[in-house]
Amino acid sequence: MDSIYKKFPSNMAPGDFWRQIKRTVNGEPVSDEQISMIVSTIRDTLQLAPDDQLLDLACGNGALSQYFFDDCHSFLGVDISEILIDVAKRYFEQPNRKFVLKDVGEYIVSEPCPQRFTKVLCYGSFSYFPELTARQVLTRLNREFVNVDRVFIGNLPDLELHEAFYTDGKSHDHELKMADSLIGIWRSPSEFEALAEDCGWRCSIQRMPREFYAGHYRYDVLLARDRA
């Protein structure tokens, strides 16, 4: 699985964390208030507990991951970008809070002890997974990561709202289903619900507050198991 983040962050200063992962508005890093909104939403939704072992898929440079270190027992972040993982290791890695360089599609089938994890996070990255990878990730999380009871997938682009993002008056239909496009694959909430259910998950759609900078065209998802 290729990624726009393999080379793009090389243009950024090592400590320019939010620009490195394009958490920006008009090229400028989003405000601390916006980051706090993201962090609070993830915390509230994942319901992290002191004994949780958190897996962060496509974790980027760890700038967001670090906010959850004190909320869980252990942490593993996985990303395909050598540049971003180097930043994560340099600035954020700690004992029991580790980052590894690996393609998520490869990692999800090679993790030697998937049952150790209890919660999963994937923020702002899922739309860049090719369709087969997206389906494989969700299916493997359900079948092999058997102790994971909640998965938060954040900042998904809503197909029904793409014109709120593309305001240039041109048609962008040709790129809405391309994983390697600027935003990745756009899915309507109903499309994502169908995908999640096909992979064994119960899916809940969430919306950020109106003041969230991307709330007019993105949504979040909570995946949970049906415990018999």
Outline where the language-model segments fall.
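Nucleotide donor/acceptor-binding cores
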Residues: D52, T118
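Short catalytic micro-motifs in class I SAM-dependent methyltransferases
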Residues: G124-S125
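Short glycine-rich, flexible loops that bind phosphorylated cofactors or substrates
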Residues: Y128-F129, E160
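A conserved beta-strand element that flanks and buttresses the S-adenosyl-L-methionine
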Residues: L121
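Class I S-adenosylmethionine-dependent transferase superfamily signal
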Residues: F68, L141-N142
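Conserved beta-strand/loop positions that form the S-adenosyl-L-methionine
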Residues: L57
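Class I (Rossmann-like) S-adenosyl-L-methionine-dependent methyltransferase catalytic domain
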Residues: M1-L46, P50, N61-R97, L101-E111, ...
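A short, conserved alpha-helix within the catalytic core of class I
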Residues: F129-L141
